[in-house]
Amino acid sequence: FPTRRSSDLMPLAIFLTLAGGLQDAYSYNCRGKVFANAQTGNIVLLGQNLAEGNWGVALHYLIPLLAFISGVYVAVRIQNLCKESEKIHWRQIVLVIQIILLFLVGLFPQSMNVPANAMMSFSCAMQVNAFRKFHGIPCATTMCIGNMRSATEMLCKYQVTGNQELKKK
């Protein structure tokens, strides 16, 4: 048996991070210029299209936002329902749901971009909610800006203090 939580394993962290980046690239480039993970981008594009009176286009950005909110909600519900389980960890359920949803998205034709993007945003939200830390250090497996900020901060603190522990973070 592993001595640490499987959610802290490096291969899983790498896989989740790559999957998060690929989901955004796929949804934006292949599914109608909508982000699966970068909800800030969707908020900006939603606001821009509302300001320009492009109501139909704006809806394409609102739906993934609502799906993201729903994904966080469902992940929290799964966590609460499974907190007493000794057989399966709630994060495993989240991963299984995510795999199923993303597999199904791959089967959707281009004419179904709106539900495909909603499912990807829902899936992303579940991942972001389930995998918040790696070795006790906060990280986001689907977004890079927070991780870039944290890495830069740790690098600067290490250079100032010389504290070897900061190099590990």
Where is each model-derived feature located?
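C-terminal ends and interior cores of transmembrane alpha-helices
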Residues: 99-113
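Interfacial helix-start motif at the membrane-water boundary
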Residues: 48-65
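Cytoplasmic-side transmembrane-helix entry/capping segments in multi-pass membrane proteins
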Residues: 87-96, 116-119, 140-143
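Substrate-agnostic recognition of the 12-TM MFS/MFS-like secondary transporter fold
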Residues: 41-47, 53, 120-169
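Pair of pore-lining "gating" transmembrane helices in MFS-fold secondary transporters
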Residues: 8-37, 41
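Short, small-residue-biased leader/transition segments that mark boundaries at the very start
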Residues: 1-6
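Helix-to-loop junctions at the C-terminal end of transmembrane segments
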Residues: 72-87
